Amino acid sequence: MRLRRKPWARPELAACDFYVDDPPSYKGRWREFFDNSNPIHLELGCGKGGFISELAADNQNINYIAVDIKSEVLALAKRKIEKEYKERGIQEIKNIRLMSHNIELIDNMLDTVDFIEKIYINFCNPWPKTPYKKKRLTHGKQLIKYKQFLASGAEIWFKTDDDGLFEDSVKYFEENGFIIKYKTWNLHESGFGENVPTEHEIMFSEEGIPIKFLIAEYKQKIHQAVCIGINIKEEN
């Protein structure tokens, strides 16, 4: 569904203390920008902010970078974050940075020294037609870029409603040196206890669509033979 243009969105973001206007200018300097040594987590495609607002408010000791390309949704995310923090009595929003950026060019704004420890990819476009599959946020083309700035032992948490995308994504991760630590074809029936639901997740669940979820771990310079014998926990 196309989001209507909101004339107030860009001016409101420009006045926001936790909005970053020029993300590439901080490439290699995100820890300096947050002004602390806390871990940095990244959400690709933050949408209206329901997920990141709750997650960041729950984890004040973690820094979060939330990326989307549309100012209209980022402005809604900004308001959602402010509302969540206010309701919890948190005076300042110090551990979130919102920004508009093309995720296909994510390596333009993050570098090896940024050491991202976790990436969240929630309900991205499945791009089901073969000519467009390279646009998937879990495609090998993208994973190669993520590996440039992931810390060793970093994780990617991936959720989707799309069976084909999920099945293909498992292959993408395995082909690019990731270990699948956890995988379920029905997250809400799996007993997994660390889930923060997104707006899309709630909508799909109400329609009876099972939510697929995995955690993929990246180990730098890991030899493929090390993967042999690794136990993969899977819930059916």
Swiss-Prot record:
GO CC aspect terms = tRNA methyltransferase complex
Molecular function as annotated in GO? tRNA (guanine(46)-N7)-methyltransferase activity
Q: Please write the reaction equations for the catalytic activity of this protein.
A: guanosine(46) in tRNA + S-adenosyl-L-methionine = N(7)-methylguanosine(46) in tRNA + S-adenosyl-L-homocysteine
Record carries keyword tRNA processing: yes
- Give the keywords, sorted: Methyltransferase, S-adenosyl-L-methionine, Transferase, tRNA processing
Q: What class of enzyme is it?
A: transferase
Q: List the pathway annotation.
A: tRNA modification; N(7)-methylguanine-tRNA biosynthesis
Q: What is its EC number?
A: 2.1.1.33
- Binding of S-adenosyl-L-methionine occurs at 43, 68, 102, 125
Binding-site positions, substrate: 129, 161
SUPFAM superfamilies from the xrefs? Answer: S-adenosyl-L-methionine-dependent methyltransferases
Name the family the entry cites. Answer: Belongs to the class I-like SAM-binding methyltransferase superfamily. TrmB family.
Function as written in the Swiss-Prot or TrEMBL entry: Catalyzes the formation of N(7)-methylguanine at position 46 (m7G46) in tRNA.
Tell me the protein's name. tRNA (guanine-N(7)-)-methyltransferase
Which organism was this protein described from? Answer: Ruminiclostridium cellulolyticum (strain ATCC 35319 / DSM 5812 / JCM 6584 / H10) (Clostridium cellulolyticum)
Name of the encoding gene: trmB
